[in-house]
């Protein structure tokens, strides 16, 4: 009996050693002939797994960029390379000028577990990605967005009235403003009160999405089959968090969609879907696709609008001299008997610059959604391997410099 267990243990040990050796051989054979971008020291087999930041990643990558005197940083974890772009110039060179090679996305398994499926931001390059992208580009072209100007003006003035009535709830009023505009555009549904249930739906979805870890960098992203294992085996907080908060993403997709009214960006998709369904024709858009497209608009517009308004107010409080100059420009352009509208925007140059400075001073998403390369690429003598994820630190170092 003892000999049997010893034999089984020896076989297991042999297989483990063989696996490690094969992995090491594959790693050695895959070594690039050109240098990779600089980065922190790596460990054998593990690479940078133990140093890749799980929290406040943008600040850590910015620190490494200064430490290694490079606007492009490379890290590797369990065989997957990630290149971090730390300046606007490098981002333009790689993501814009070479966009055809870097248009793909890595698979976001963790976000799939959370409920983000057919949403453009997280889709890999392919037919579905092209379909979603074309729809959103058409819906929000420079011409089409003008039809929402009246809605934006109405909601902005309603927000001002709410703040005048209850100045202590100004932040909640701004949250309602953001949700009201995006929900009307996406689903044709009105949000009139500061305590509307849709505001909590948006808050829950944003919390779930923003607090589950760095996209494409969790254990389940690196080893996708882990998603099928129970928490007692995996013991990964990000996977457990995604499972616990899946309800919030499902609610974001299902509740507004069920109450959708006419005259919104997804209305014609739903109408086309029902027409084809009644005729028994093949569907290009599934219901999940339509929900995903509407959800992408909802999640992208809600938090960014609210955060920009809050940061604007913060800066006006901190810099009253800037606020005074902005007020002087408003008085000069529109006087004191009316409120501004979109026709006044070209003349409000100083206020436009304030808004642009807010974008620069406090980027709303310091760490952008990763891209993935379709083929090997060479940038300034450095190799970016095929399948590499690119995370762009949005203007983080530009503001620091």
Where are these regions (language model features)?
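N-terminal membrane-proximal hinge/A-helix region immediately C-terminal to the signal-anchor transmembrane segment
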Residues: 2-115, 131, 153-158, 370-372, ...
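Cytochrome P450 I-helix active-site segment
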Residues: 38-41, 153, 200-207, 263-272, ...
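Cytochrome P450 catalytic-domain helical core, especially the substrate-recognition surface
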Residues: 41-62, 81, 108-187, 200-258, ...
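Conserved, well-structured core segments
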Residues: 43-45, 73-77, 81-86, 120-122, ...
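Hydrophobic, repeat-rich solenoid/adaptor surfaces of innate immune receptors and signaling proteins
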Residues: 85-88, 186, 256, 308-313, ...
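Cytochrome P450 core scaffold surrounding the K-helix E-X-X-R motif
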Residues: 91-96, 192, 397-401
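Cytochrome P450 catalytic-core helices
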Residues: 178, 304-322, 327-329, 395
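Conserved cytochrome P450 K-helix/beta-meander segment immediately N-terminal to the heme-binding cysteine loop
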Residues: 386, 392-401
């Amino acid at each position: 009996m003892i000999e049997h267990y010893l034999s089984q243990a020896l076989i297991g040990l042999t297989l483990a050693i063989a696996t490690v050796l094969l992995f090491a051989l594959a790693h050695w054979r895959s070594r690039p002939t050109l240098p990779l971008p600089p980065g922190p020291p790596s460990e054998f087999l593990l690479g940078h797994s133990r140093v890749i930041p799980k929290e406040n990643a943008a600040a850590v990558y910015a620190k490494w960029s200064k430490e290694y005197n490079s606007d492009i940083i490379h890290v590797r974890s369990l065989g997957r390379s990630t290149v971090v772009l730390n300046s606007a110039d490098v981002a333009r060179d790689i993501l814009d000028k070479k966009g055809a090679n870097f248009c793909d996305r890595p698979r976001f398994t963790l976000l799939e577990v959370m409920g983000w499926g057919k949403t453009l931001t997280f889709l890999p390059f392919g037919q579905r990605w092209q379909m979603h992208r074309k729809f959103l580009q058409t819906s929000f072209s420079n011409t089409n967005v003008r039809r929402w100007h009246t809605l934006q003006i109405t909601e902005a003035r309603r927000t001002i009235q709410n703040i005048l009535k209850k100045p202590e709830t100004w932040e909640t009023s701004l949250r309602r403003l953001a949700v009201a505009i995006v929900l009307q555009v996406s689903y044709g549904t009105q949000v009139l009160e500061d305590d509307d249930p849709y505001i909590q739906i948006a808050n829950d979805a944003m919390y779930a999405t923003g607090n589950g870890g760095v996209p494409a960098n969790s254990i389940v992203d690196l080893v996708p089959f882990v998603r099928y294992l129970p928490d007692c085996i995996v013991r990964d907080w990000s996977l457990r968090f995604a499972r616990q908060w899946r309800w919030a993403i499902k609610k974001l997709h299902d509740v507004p969609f069920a109450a959708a009214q006419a005259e919104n960006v997804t209305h014609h998709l739903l109408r086309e879907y029902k027409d084809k369904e009644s005729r028994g024709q093949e569907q290009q858009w599934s219901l999940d696709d339509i929900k995903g497209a509407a959800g992408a608009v909802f999640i992208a517009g809600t938090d960014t609008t609210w955060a920009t308004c809050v940061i604007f107010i913060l800066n006006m409080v901190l810099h009253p001299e800037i606020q005074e100059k902005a007020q002087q420009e408003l008085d000069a352009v529109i006087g004191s008997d009316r409120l501004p509208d979109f026709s006044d925007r070209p003349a409000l140059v100083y206020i436009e610059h304030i808004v642009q400075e807010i974008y620069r001073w406090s980027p709303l998403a310091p760490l952008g959604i990763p891209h993935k390369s379709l083929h090997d690429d060479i940038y300034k003598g450095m190799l970016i391997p095929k399948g590499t994820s690119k995370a762009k630190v949005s203007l983080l170092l530009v503001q620091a410099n």
